[in-house]
Every structure is written in C-alpha cells, then in structure tokens.
Swiss-Prot record:
Cofactor dependency: Mn(2+); Mg(2+)
UniProt KW Transcription keyword: no
Known EC number: 3.1.26.4
Annotated cofactor note: Manganese or magnesium. Binds 1 divalent metal ion per monomer in the absence of substrate. May bind a second metal ion after substrate binding.
Recorded catalytic activity of this chain's protein: Endonucleolytic cleavage to 5'-phosphomonoester
Record protein name field: Ribonuclease HII
Protein purpose: Endonuclease that specifically degrades the RNA of RNA-DNA hybrids.
Residues annotated to bind a divalent metal cation: 78-79, 170
Domain RNase H type-2: 72-255
Gene Ontology biological process: DNA replication, removal of RNA primer; mismatch repair
Annotated organism of origin: Staphylococcus haemolyticus (strain JCSC1435)
Keyword list, A-Z: Cytoplasm, Endonuclease, Hydrolase, Manganese, Metal-binding, Nuclease
Length: 255
C-alpha cells in the first residue's frame, strides 16, 4: 500500500544514515512531496554527519591520550574575559564524562548565545566534574592580564575534587606537576577546552549581568565589560566603578 506524504516523512525521520536513505524504496516514489522530503532528510543527515565529524576531529587530543591510558582523567582549561575593560577574568576546568558526545561544541565565540546556553546546561548535567576560578580587576591591575589569567586557571584547577592525569590548556602553561599540553586556539581544536570555553563564557556573562544590576548605566549586561560606545559613554557620565580595570585604557588615563 502506498504511504501518504506524512507517513513517508515519518519513515524518513527514523532513517539515520545516508546509506540507508539512498537505498530506501521511497526513492522510487516519483511524487514531488516525497522527493522533496527525501532531499530535506538528506541535507539533515549530511549536516549531522558534518557536526559529528567535526566533534571527532576536535576529540583527537583526548583520543590519543586515552589510547595511552584508557583510565586517564583529561581536564580542559580555558578562560574568558582577557579583553574587557571591566569585570574579572574567569577560567573553567572541565573533566568530560566517559563516552561524551556534546555535538556542537566549538570555540564559544563561534557558538550562538542560545546554543551556548543549551550546551552549558548539558555540560553541567553530564560532565564528570567542572570548577571555576576568577581573578579580580585588582589582581589584573597588579599582576597584568596574562599572569592573572594563570591565577584564575590555577584556582579553577585547585577546586577539582579529582586530580587530572593530563591538562589540555588553551595557549597557556601552568606551574603544576600535572602533565599538560598547551594548544594554540585550543578552544577550536579540543572538545575539552571548548567545553571549558563555553562554561566559562556563560558563567562570566551571568556575573556581568549581576554587576549591571549593581551598576546600571554601562550596559554591562550587553557588552560584558567590553569597550562599546554605551560603555564608554557610561564611563564619561558616571565615572569608574570598582569593577573597572585601572591598568586598561581609557580608564588608566581617567584615574
């Protein structure tokens, strides 16, 4: 018996590989609606495969470490907030769960806000462990942003209950006895670092919204401390807050 268009769409929705789709008897159905549904499903499957392939590529560092030690606890570490004029720098340390597959993970700057929020919830619910570390604006001014970032990363690492066997760090090195690999643009090359990037970003964004409630007029809830026009206008009208980095221009020239 010939399926209705809706019945055919349901059948197609349950096909999970291009190979099965191409061999399915529905390809012989010449009805326009059926052929359009097949084309749509083919595009969906190709996109899903592209996302999976990207995830597997980003899992390369983790896979190599696990090949050497299947029980290894691998910790990804990244930070957000080096460039803003206000607010702390925030680091996150993440140990992903065994058999993880958080499809869509990437550098937090490449992921939309809505997808970041979804991924952040999945990560918080699913990973083996995560922890945050902060360095304050005062510490940034005293130590410089690079050294303050190291402080934030070390604080995140120290909050973990489980001691990692290996660290994957985005373009930094830490003073620790734990073996580590520093990866340039690691948040786009390692799923563990990408997870840390997204979780740190969401944590810091929420923190800047709280600061915006305390100090309205700078639009911290939108610019998260970066030097937008609204932020600079706020500085000129309202002055410097305790959350501003006094070693960063134009604040440095205002003190």
């Amino acid at each position: 018996m010939t399926q209705t268009i809706n019945e055919a769409k349901h059948i197609l929705s349950e096909i999970n590989s291009i190979e099965v789709l191409e061999q399915h008897e529905l390809n012989q159905d010449v009805r326009k609606g059926i052929q359009q549904a097949i084309t749509r499903r083919r595009k969906q499957l190709l996109k899903e495969q592209e996302i999976l392939d990207h995830y597997n590529t980003m899992n390369k560092f983790e896979s190599e470490l696990l090949n050497n030690n299947p029980q290894a606890l691998i910790c990804g570490i990244d930070e957000v907030g080096r460039g803003p004029l206000a607010g702390p720098v925030v680091a996150c340390a993440v140990i992903l769960n065994e058999g993880h597959r958080y499809l869509g993970l990437d550098d937090s700057k490449k992921v939309t806000a809505s997808k970041r929020q979804i991924l952040n919830k999945k990560l918080k619910d699913g990973v083996l462990e995560y922890a945050y570390g902060l360095a304050s604006p005062e510490e940034i001014d005293e130590l410089n942003i690079y050294n303050a970032t190291q402080v934030a990363m070390n604080r995140a690492l120290s909050q973990l209950v489980n001691r990692p066997d290996h660290l994957l760090i985005d373009a930094m090195s830490l003073d620790t006895t734990i073996p580590q690999t520093s990866i340039i643009k690691g948040d786009a090359k390692s799923v563990s670092i990408a997870a840390a990037s997204i979780m740190a970003k969401e944590y810091r964004d929420d923190l800047m919204k709280e600061i915006a409630d305390e100090y309205p007029g700078y639009e911290f809830e939108k610019n998260v401390g970066y030097g937008t026009k609204a932020h600079l206008d706020g500085l000129n009208k309202l002055g410097i807050t305790p959350y501003h980095r006094k070693s960063f221009e134009p604040i440095k020239s205002m003190t």
